[in-house]
Amino acid sequence: MSMACAPAHAGCAKADFEAVVDEAAGSLRDMNAANKPKFQEKLRLLKDKRGWTQEQFLHEAAPLVADDKINTFDLQSTALLEKIASGGETGAAAAKPDCAMLDTLRASMKTLVETQAEKWTYMTTKIDAELAR
């Protein structure tokens, strides 16, 4: 997937704005599809290793999926998603597309994907450390 920004003077079309939104959604879907099953399997392994009941598991594993750092990643991602969606709609609806705005949207999408990758890395590192104990 190319995240390079085209120069603002190169011209852009309304469809380019919609494409940025679609690309962000696709990137996130792909990342979740790649990471979620592996992470869930590690959670199951931890539950089995510790011999937790389902109730214990829900309590003990909670910090692995929700802590201050994960919440910060989620807040950053939500803000970026809103910015991308809003900018995509605004850019697609404009009489004359603003190519500088398109570059900003592409940069936001890149940051969003990086933020989610950092979140998955952080969560995976946490659960790997627990499995190693």
Question: Which residues fall in each region the model found?
Answer:
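C-terminal amphipathic alpha-helix
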Residues: 14-17, 31, 35, 90-133
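Heptad-repeat register of long alpha-helical coiled-coils used for dimerization/oligomerization
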Residues: 11-14, 18-21, 60, 64-67, ...
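Immediate post-signal-peptide N-terminus of mature secreted/exported proteins
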Residues: 8-55, 132-133
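N-terminal signal peptide c-region/cleavage motif recognized by signal peptidases
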Residues: 3-7
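Short, Lys/Arg-enriched charge-dense amphipathic segments
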Residues: 23-31, 36, 56-68, 117-124
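Charge-rich, solvent-exposed alpha-helical interaction surfaces
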Residues: 20-23, 27-30, 42-46, 76, ...
